[in-house]
């Protein structure tokens, strides 16, 4: 069995065994260097194929049954070989008389086919590659490139054309028609929030306990419990009104004189050296007024004569009353709510209790409140500053107590002048706002900051939009970038990331035929830095097609060789 291939003598012997004439293959005189080192001869490829075909036809006429066999060529580690496989088949023949003849025929056939395959491989290696095998003709059909690609494969128009004036027949890419990606969607509107403006009554004092009503500041009443001189005068006036009483003290009794038992004044006109009756006038508070003497016909008050015992009793009574007044002193107004001691003097009344002025203090800072307004929280007094620090709501912006109007928004309390737009710093005054990341924005700044911008006008999109080319568009702005016309059925062409209609896309891409002025789709001729339909790339004089041959350019126009020589030679 041959392993390196059959030479021509072996092939002749094989054909002689088969009853055929010798091969008529001629060996060329030129020796070519091939990849197979074992053979230095070059055979004509077509003659070898014709010879093999005749052998196959001869074998088909043989009466014995031949099975289909495919034998690969032996591997050569030095070169890359092409595996050629041939299949030979025949109709089933009648039952052979002897089994041994069939087996011998099969063995011979195996040797024959293996030798043929080896010879064919060797012959193919010896045949040099001609330039025509690498020429792609202009009329060859190449598959169209993928969509949105601007590059294409270039094929030479003819192997006989000159290098500098070859019209290149190329396949123009189909413009990418985008139909499914241009969809109209409606953007979800952001949530609109409402700021609540709160105003409290009175002094607008806020408490941390929302269930309780806002306390109002209370006023303090101060009184003085020390009795004045007017009060003492009134007391004495009520006890003893002034009454003038004339008391006559009788002289000592003289035995030689007559006693006078009349209760009236006696005027004795004796010698001054004699004893006289003394008259003493004394103003005494006796607690009652004199009654007129009914025996007096002239209705005049006659002085009352007080004996010595009555005068002593009266003096003792007055002395006792004065002592009682001195020992009693001022009366207590009550017990102080701070120190629990009696209150004498100035008193402060607040929260239903009495206080010493120095004991009525703020429960938090212990500063005396005096007659200032105070705030009551849990039955305890607080000054205004401490009450705001402890119980008033705090502004989310400045963290200061809110004692005036406040705005409730975003779950927090704000001063009216501190609840403003994060971007423009304008107050909302209880109006609508938009929230993003816990911060308020007005409508204009919210859309200008966070909304998607249109690919045509670069303005924020608030309503419906079109999704195309990886961005969003206002429906009225998604138009051809050249003629500003809307697209029919949503079909458009992309060039440079912008949408175009069919006509202006080819103008922008330079894919307009220079001959007819229409868009070039499919195969085209690239010549003179222009694109042409293959049927429109013709000689400017004789109008014969030039796509398959050479041309000569003159003044920017193509000419065939004959016309160019006639016109410009």
UniProtKB/Swiss-Prot annotation:
Which residue ranges does the record annotate as region Disordered? 62-103, 129-311
What cellular component terms from Gene Ontology apply here?
Answer: cell cortex; filamentous actin; filopodium; filopodium tip; focal adhesion; protein-containing complex
Coiled-coil regions listed in the entry: none
| PROSITE patterns, per database record | LIM_DOMAIN_1 (PS00478), LIM_DOMAIN_2 (PS50023)
Q: Which residues form the LIM zinc-binding domain?
A: 334-391, 393-452, 453-510, 511-569
What is this protein's tissue specificity according to the annotation? Expressed in the upper and lower cup of the fruiting body.
- The residue numbers the entry assigns to motif LD motif 3 are 232-239
The residue numbers the entry assigns to motif LD motif 2 are: 106-112
Low complexity composition bias: residue spans: 79-102, 150-161, 207-217, 273-301
> Its Gene Ontology biological processes?
calcium-dependent cell-cell adhesion via plasma membrane cell adhesion molecules; cell migration; cell motility; cell-substrate adhesion; chemotaxis to cAMP; chemotaxis to folate; culmination involved in sorocarp development; endocytosis
Bias class Polar residues marks the residues at 62-78, 162-188, 196-206
Q: Where in the cell is it found?
A: Cytoplasm, Cell cortex; Cell projection, Filopodium; Cell junction, Focal adhesion; Cytoplasm, Cytoskeleton
**InterPro entries, per the entry:** PDZ-LIM_domain (IPR050604), Znf_LIM (IPR001781)
- Motif LD motif 1 located where? 10-18
Briefly, what is this protein's role? Required for cell-substrate adhesion, cell sorting, slug migration, and cell differentiation. May function upstream of limB.
What the record says about family reads: Belongs to the paxillin family.
Could you tell me what this protein is called? Paxillin-B
State the organism of origin. Dictyostelium discoideum
From which lineage does this chain's organism come? Eukaryota, Amoebozoa, Evosea, Eumycetozoa, Dictyostelia
As recorded in Swiss-Prot or TrEMBL, the protein's gene is named paxB
